[in-house]
Amino acid sequence: MTTFKEAMTFKDVAVVFTEEELGLLDLAQRKLYRDVMLENFRNLLSVGHQAFHRDTFHFLREEKIWMMKTAIQREGNSGDKIQTEMETVSEAGTHQEWSFQQIWEKIASDLTRSQDLVINSSQFSKEGDFPCQTEAGLSVIHTRQKSSQGNGYKPSFSDVSHFDFHQQLHSGEKSHTCDECGKNFCYISALRIHQRVHMGEKCYKCDVCGKEFSQSSHLQTHQRVHTGEKPFKCVECGKGFSRRSALNVHHKLHTGEKPYNCEECGKAFIHDSQLQEHQRIHTGEKPFKCDICGKSFCGRSRLNRHSMVHTAEKPFRCDTCDKSFRQRSALNSHRMIHTGEKPYKCEECGKGFICRRDLYTHHMVHTGEKPYNCKECGKSFRWASCLLKHQRVHSGEKPFQCEECGKGFYTNSQCYSHQRSHSGEKPYKCVECGKGYKRRLDLDFHQRVHTGEKLYNCKECGKSFSRAPCLLKHERLHSG
């Protein structure tokens, strides 16, 4: 039986994802995956208890180049021959999407071509001119035993610490802990990237708006806001997304999957962050505070929308009527008013809606569901935003004021509708008769005159009404 020592290659310690598993990672996670594998390769060169010869191994990090000089043992017809090669691997620019093929080929293949590399540890230890910098004093030298037939392989380790290190790679043990927040990581490189959050280090700056980021992958994702690039396409409906994670969340709209449930009211959500924001409605927690007026919000997106009230910023403009909006989604919904498009249909009554949220609210008319309850008066609401608006009745808060007359309102939409009384604007036109209205809700009520639709039924006598206030007025006749 022949025994010899061989260096553990990168493929021995790499964390390998399948194509399907990698498809679930967003760009930042792929960047982290690449960094972790590079860290693993550096560990192979740096953590051994034997020193490596300067002329045989050299691994350095320059501006954007990884360079490696390897000694490769090649076997040919003429016998063993030592050949030295210089391998240069250029890092991808900030605008490159790292696919599975690129990650594995550039790192696993290019950096580990030394599959047949043999390290003569006794020779290198005598040189001693390239001191090894270790973090854990670990050696990554395998002892490989081959039978005379060449068909037996048994990896072993020179001491217990070597085995512990090797096992950690397979077990996913998170031994690197952040001193700031206590979060754990499998690899020191992942910890270093995470620590930039606490240090406030932002090395990557957007040339367009000047915004800074701690990771180049975050900058790349941000730049798509300016370019409009949406490389991730939904195979079901063709909708594009700038981030893979957003596409993964969108897929759940087609599958109907809502794995995150609220324990208070039972409402289900597609994403964990949606559940966390929703739960703050029950707890009353509002951690996001406006620096200008001090108003607090349960979600960062709500704070961002509110901030535009102070700046009056409305960057999204309708090409048809020149109306401006603070959000692109609001502009897209508005355009359907001009086109008459109502893509979301109710399966119960066939009524169409411009946005999915309106359809969801409409479904509650049929089910009678009102999951949001006011703790002050017990009144129930179908939508969380309606509850928040209602709570201002109890608090007396009227944060939205008319610039013309100074009148205060509970909601921005009420203030906006009121301002049309000064301007005389009636942007919502009936396609049947051309009559204009200040509010879309009034237009919806009016259109029922043409359609004959009466959604609100009296439980006592079965009489139907086109508007909820008419039903309430009628029910008082029965109650006396």
From Swiss-Prot:
KRAB domain segment(s): 8-78
Keyword Methyltransferase: no
SMART domains given in the database record: KRAB, ZnF_C2H2
Localization in the cell: Nucleus
Family annotation (Gene3D superfamilies): 6.10.140.140, Classic Zinc Finger
One example of a Gene Ontology biological process annotation: positive regulation of transcription by RNA polymerase II
Alphabetized CDD domains for the sequence: KRAB_A-box
GO molecular function (one): RNA polymerase II cis-regulatory region sequence-specific DNA binding
Alphabetized InterPro entries for the sequence: GLI_C2H2-zinc-finger, KRAB, KRAB_dom_sf, Znf_C2H2_sf, Znf_C2H2_type
Superkingdom of origin: Eukaryota
GO CC, alphabetical: nucleus
Zn finger residue spans: C2H2-type: 176-198, 204-226, 232-254, 260-282, 288-310, 316-338, 344-366, 372-394, 400-422, 428-450, 456-478
Keywords from the named record: DNA-binding, Metal-binding, Nucleus, Repeat, Transcription, Transcription regulation, Zinc, Zinc-finger
Record bears the keyword Zinc-finger: yes
UniProt family annotation: Belongs to the krueppel C2H2-type zinc-finger protein family.
Protein task: May be involved in transcriptional regulation.
Protein's name in the database: Zinc finger protein
